[in-house]
Amino acid sequence: MSVPEPKAALERLHHWAQLTPLHVALRHKRQGQWHAWRWIDVLRDVGRLADGLRQQGFSEQSRLALSGAFEPNLLLLALAAQSVGGQVLTLADDLEPQALEQQLWRLHPSHACVQGRQPDWTFTQRLDFAQLLGPVDPVQRLQRWWQSGAETVLWSEEGTHWQGGLAVVLEQWLDSGHGLAFPETQASARRDRSEVAPTGLLLSPERLQHLADEIESRLAAHGTWRRRLCDWAIAHPHSGLRRLLKNRVRKLLGFQRLGYIWQPLKTTAEPIWLVEFKRDIA
């Protein structure tokens, strides 16, 4: 899947780096600690990565294949490749090694960056992010604490398995100028999300359904009096019990500040919890 509109994305990046250079643009939890990139940091890193790509022979005729979880390194590298004028492609990050190699062989990109896998493919040039970026002091990125309740924060816990997702995340992030946060891993997503308490979600329909299943698993079993009480509360929108239950679920999932949920223009049937949250937001 190609990532479109590189010129517009880069223009927005320059805009925010000039308008709010010291505001936090990206956050990512690494080894249990939150790291932050300001807009000026993002612009500088994209420039350094672009120089690194050129040194690796990347040009306007080149194509970069990316595969992995959405996090700052992946977004920065995508923007750097676009700034050089090359094309960015994404491959699902949940492919088996053989299937991934077959996809790369079929697409035949000039360069590839695949998280967590280090095979040497003879038909494409594998890139190393740290080598492209050059020396950097990780302490500069370390953010030991911040008060999330005072700012607008978008949240994504996806990867390149979300077809078209990278374009969505880049567009929503760069158009809004809000900070964007990512969990350390999929397994730690709920815990990390609760720490951030995001105001906006950038998730695929599949991930939204996963959250619906998580909510369902935490409710009482069907047929029990506790579940009948929950169902009654949901059916009576003005009851205090309904508000109590919803607030508890919101806090459990880290949605106590949620005010925006991205969705494609054409959507299938929505999970009940999503309908309820959207009703509250409206």
Residue ranges of predicted features:
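A short N-terminal helical cap/helix-turn-helix that marks the beginning
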Residues: 4-26, 44
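Short helix-loop-beta connector
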Residues: 58-63, 148-151, 256-257
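Conserved AMP-binding/adenylate-forming core of the ANL superfamily
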Residues: 26-57, 69-71, 138
